[in-house]
């Protein structure tokens, strides 16, 4: 149990048996009437977001979430297999839980897996990863880094926009939150 005054981003709440993550929160003290807390919550399993308002100071149920360092090993059918870095226990995680993180994971990628009562909830990636371009149209002579972008496919199969001068085999840094090209890696 926690008070609504203790809400912060990333906190997992248990509301009516469903797990929700606090994405945004704002304490509001109007001139008239009692204070309240306005929140934006994201459903842990479905990813759906809702706006919910709580009266200030009331108690809400929090869920115990254990975040563990894990390593992505391989894909087994539709499932992704992760290994706990501390005790080498392996977890099979479904594609609905991995979500968009699959676009940036290569074998042996270090990630954080959030567990609730031993069940995986979601996968957190580092903010950026280095991936190799496996396909892109050839650049034209005279292409400059500021001349525009073109589509490129990286080794995970994900497609990003890169500057025109980049070629197949180039390693690039990609932001895992937005999927944007951040720079070339030597």
Curated annotation (Swiss-Prot):
Pfam families: EFP, EFP_N, Elong-fact-P_C. It comes from the Bacteria. Keywords: Cytoplasm, Elongation factor, Protein biosynthesis. PROSITE patterns: EFP (PS01275). GO terms for cellular component: cytoplasm. GO terms for biological process: peptide biosynthetic process. InterPro entries: Elong-fact-P_C, NA-bd_OB-fold, Rib_uL2_dom2, Transl_elong_fac_P/YeiP, Transl_elong_KOW-like, Transl_elong_P/YeiP_cen, Transl_elong_P/YeiP_CS, Transl_elongation_fac_P. GO terms for molecular function: translation elongation factor activity. Pathway: Protein biosynthesis; polypeptide chain elongation. It is found in: Cytoplasm. Belongs to the elongation factor P family. PANTHER family: ELONGATION FACTOR P, ELONGATION FACTOR P (EF-P) FAMILY PROTEIN. Involved in peptide bond synthesis. Stimulates efficient translation and peptide-bond synthesis on native or reconstituted 70S ribosomes in vitro. Probably functions indirectly by altering the affinity of the ribosome for aminoacyl-tRNA, thus increasing their reactivity as acceptors for peptidyl transferase. This is Elongation factor P. It comes from Beutenbergia cavernae (strain ATCC BAA-8 / DSM 12333 / CCUG 43141 / JCM 11478 / NBRC 16432 / NCIMB 13614 / HKI 0122). The gene is efp.
């Amino acid at each position: 149990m926690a008070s609504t005054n203790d809400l912060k981003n990333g906190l997992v709440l248990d509301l009516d048996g469903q797990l929700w993550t606090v994405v945004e929160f704002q304490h509001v003290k109007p001139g008239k009437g009692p204070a309240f807390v306005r929140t934006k919550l994201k459903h842990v399993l479905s990813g759906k977001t809702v706006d919910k308002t709580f009266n200030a100071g009331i108690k809400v149920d929090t869920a115990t979430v254990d975040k563990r360092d894990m390593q992505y090993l391989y894909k087994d059918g539709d499932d992704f297999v992760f290994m706990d870095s501390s005790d080498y226990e392996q977890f099979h995680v479904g594609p609905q839980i991995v979500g968009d993180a699959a676009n940036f994971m290569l074998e042996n990628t270090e990630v954080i897996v959030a567990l609730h009562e031993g069940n995986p909830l979601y996968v957190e990636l580092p903010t950026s990863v280095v991936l190799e371009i496996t396909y892109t149209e050839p650049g034209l002579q005279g292409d400059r880094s500021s001349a525009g972008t073109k589509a490129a496919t990286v080794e995970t199969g994900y497609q990003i926009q890169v500057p025109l001068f980049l070629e197949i085999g180039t390693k690039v840094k990609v932001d895992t939150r937005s999927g944007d090209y951040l720079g070339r890696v030597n």
